Amino acid sequence: TGHIIAAANAVIAPAADRMKASHDIAIDRKRSKGPPGGEMAALDPVAHGRVQVLDCPSGDVAQAMAAVDELVRLSRLDPEWSWSRAAIIARDWRRLTPARAYAESLGIPVEMANESMPSIWRLREMQQFIDALRRDTTRLLAIRDLVDVLNAIPSNRWTDLIAEGIAALAKELANKTMPVPDLVEWFAEWANDARSDQRSLLLLTAHRSKGVEFDDVVILNGGWDRPSKGEDPDAPRRLFYVAMTRARRSLAIIADGQHPFVQQGAEHVLRRAAPAIGADVALPTALYQVPDLKTVDLSWAGRLRTGHPSIASISAAKVGDPVHIVREGPTWMIQDAQGQALGRMAKSWSPPERLSFLRGEVGAIVRWRKSDNQEEYRVHLHRDVWEAIIPELVFG
């Protein structure tokens, strides 16, 4: 919007080493006929599309809560709101942890840009879906057939994700049919591409934000006033400018007193106090570890001999089932509610220091094969194909 561009240009103007020589960025011609506040000029009765500077008490937790609360406020103004078009940007990852915990506590879907999603193709649900398609490779299937196949699989967040894939294919296929081998290939490509799609409120650093845009952005305070080692004095200002220009529709900036870059008094900026946090609000301290293949010994179940009780327990396990982690020698085991081992964490994994294990659940179940392992390790494997449990863990 005009207001976001005016604020960003004012921030970058003092920088000695201009990113684009003497050319200020300008608004898209298609948008230039609209109000400088864009659609938020009419939608937001508080800021009217101006860039907000929210004055907030110091501390990572207070500002994280102010940032999330501001996005919640905006979400209530827009019936078309999607958390997948919103982001909170910080100078470093550490400041984003409380924002993650607070968003989770409010039930807001949230993801950190430095976390990787499990391989969609390897998910139990995806493999069941593909196995069902492959039962007869001579068929021509329509979208309704794919929906029927998916509906036969117990539903969870991963079947919801596959449903997104079917919806994407429906745009291409419409009322036509497609041969099974082509469908399998299409879903393999989609699974690879879909891993990088944003589906939730995204938390990321300014460095990571380069090249992506969001409708609504809040920038956290902290770390902007000093260059990192080896950086020139203008580097933080240029990085802050990058963060500001990620916002297409609305931009809020958290400050504690005078902001190092955003000056007061400009017509495109509204400075106001962030709403006070009530005394009854539980401050977020939880640390979330999302399902990540790198944290688990993926071949543990492949080393089990036929008849081992863990094999049946893994088959019976469902996404969302409670798990806990138990130390066993130098490693940590994943156990179900009955105390049966479901898997083992990677040797390189350990719980975060000074935090207690609060709860855990089966986050994902992936199919792994003997052929996925290097030749020298295959001698220890007693099965050709197995499932590995990938937990989601919460510490606090």
Positions of predicted regions on the chain:
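Glycine-rich phosphate-binding "P-loop"
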Residues: 36-66
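Alpha-helical scaffold elements adjacent to nucleotide-binding pockets in ATP/GTP-utilizing enzyme cores
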Residues: 3-11, 66, 70, 98-105, ...
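Core RecA-like ATPase module of SF1/SF2 helicases and allied nucleic-acid translocases
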Residues: 72, 76-234, 247-251, 271-282
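Conserved active-site motif detector
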Residues: 265-396
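Accessory/regulatory regions of helicases
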Residues: 51, 227-299
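Short, conserved phosphate/pyrophosphate- and ester-handling motifs at nucleotide-, phospho-/glycolipid
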Residues: 1, 211, 346
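Well-ordered alpha-helical segments embedded in enzymatic catalytic cores
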Residues: 63-73, 239
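Conserved coupling/interface region of RecA-like P-loop/ASCE motor cores
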Residues: 1-36
